[in-house]
Regions:
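N-terminal secretory signal peptides that target proteins for export/translocation
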Residues: 1-12
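Bacterial N-terminal signal peptides
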Residues: 15-27
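Histidine-acidic residue clusters that define the catalytic metal-binding segment
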Residues: 31-46, 194-235, 245
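Mature N-terminal segment immediately following signal peptide/propeptide cleavage
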Residues: 38-71
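Soluble periplasmic/extracytoplasmic beta-strand elements of cell-envelope proteins
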Residues: 55-59, 69-73, 133-137, 236-238
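Active-site-adjacent, His/Asp/Glu-enriched structural segments that form or flank metal-binding
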Residues: 74-89, 94-186, 223-234, 251-254
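Helix N-cap motif at beta-to-alpha junctions
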Residues: 140-143, 242-246
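Glycine-centered hinge/linker elements that transmit conformational signals in sensory
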Residues: 251-264
Length: 264
C-alpha cells in the first residue's frame, strides 16, 4: 500500500515509533521478571487439597451483592482424547445439561427456572485443549441455591446419566456448532494452524473434534473418556462471591466428600 498523503505518512511513522517504544519497554520489563518465581497466594483466599485429591479455592467478594460464582474445573480437555474420541470431551460437556442422578432429563433447567435463572446465562460450560469448565452463578440471599448448585456440579463430576437418546441429540447439536464455525475467519485460521501448531498435538486436537468421530462414536467410547478423566485428583472447585467464607468452604468439602463416596 502506498501513502501519498503526508499526513498519512506522518501517522505511519508515529505509529512505528510508538510500536518500537512499546517493544523496548516490554523487553526491559520482561528481563526483570523471574518466570520461575511462584506468585504468592492472595491471603483473602481460603484454599485446600482434600485427601481424595480435590482442590478448592474460596473467596468472599461482595460485588455484586447477593451473588456467588461457582466453578468446577476438570483438568482434561481435547488433548487427552484418543484418536477415536476426537470431539468427545466437548460432547460430554454438553451431556451435563442432559441430566445427572438427582437431576435427570431437564430437571437442572427446571430447578434453575424456579430461581429465576437459566442455562446459558447462569449455568454454562466450555471445553478447551487442557480443561473443561462448568460454571454456575447463583443468588446468595439464602444458602440453598449455592448448596444445590455445588451438589449439581458434584454429580456432573461423577454421576452423569449419559443416556443413549441424549448422545444422539448431542451428535446433531455438536455438528451444527461445527457448521456454524465455518465462516471466513475460521477458514483462514484453519489454514494458519499448521504453522501455528507445527509438530504439536494441538494441531490435531481441536476441541470441536472430527465430525467423522462425532457421527459414529460408540456410547461406551464417550463413557470411557468420562470415567478415565473425571477423577477427583483432576478436579478444582472455585466459590467466589458474596458468601460466608467458612460456610462456602464447608460446602466445597461436602462436594469432595460426595466424590470420595462415589470413587470408593
Amino acid at each position: 500500500m502506498k501513502f501519498t498523503n503526508l499526513n498519512n505518512l506522518s501517522l505511519v511513522k508515529l505509529f512505528l515509533k510508538v510500536l518500537v517504544f512499546v517493544a523496548v519497554i516490554f523487553n526491559v520489563h520482561a528481563a526483570e521478571i523471574d518466570l520461575n518465581k511462584i506468585l504468592p497466594m492472595d491471603n483473602k483466599i481460603t484454599y485446600g487439597k482434600l485427601d481424595n485429591g480435590v482442590t478448592y479455592y474460596v473467596k468472599n467478594n461482595q460485588i455484586p451483592k447477593n451473588k456467588a460464582y461457582v466453578e468446577l474445573v476438570i483438568k482434561a480437555g481435547s488433548l487427552h482424547e484418543n484418536d477415536d474420541q476426537q470431539g468427545l470431551a466437548h460432547l460430554l460437556e454438553h451431556m451435563a445439561f442432559n441430566g445427572t442422578k438427582s437431576f435427570p432429563k431437564n430437571k437442572i433447567d427446571s430447578y434453575l427456572n424456579s430461581l429465576g435463572l437459566s442455562i446459558g446465562a447462569d449455568f454454562n460450560a466450555s471445553t478447551g485443549f487442557t480443561k473443561t469448565i462448568y460454571k454456575f452463578q447463583v443468588p446468595t440471599n439464602t444458602i440453598e441455591p449455592l448448596d444445590t448448585g455445588v451438589h449439581i456440579l458434584s454429580e456432573i463430576a461423577s454421576e452423569l446419566t449419559l443416556e443413549d437418546e441424549a448422545f444422539e441429540r448431542e451428535r446433531k447439536i455438536v455438528e451444527e456448532e461445527w457448521r456454524m464455525d465455518l465462516g471466513k475467519f475460521d477458514r483462514i485460521l484453519e489454514q494458519q494452524k499448521p504453522y501455528i501448531f507445527k509438530n504439536s498435538k494441538y494441531l490435531v486436537r481441536d476441541p470441536i473434534g472430527k465430525m467423522e468421530v462425532i457421527r459414529n462414536f460408540k456410547y461406551q467410547t464417550a463413557k470411557d473418556y468420562y470415567h478415565q478423566w473425571y477423577r477427583p485428583e483432576l478436579m478444582v472447585v472455585f466459590i467466589i462471591g458474596d458468601i460466608d467464607q467458612k460456610k462456602a468452604e464447608q460446602i466445597a468439602c461436602e462436594l469432595a466428600l460426595h466424590l470420595l463416596l462415589q470413587y470408593n
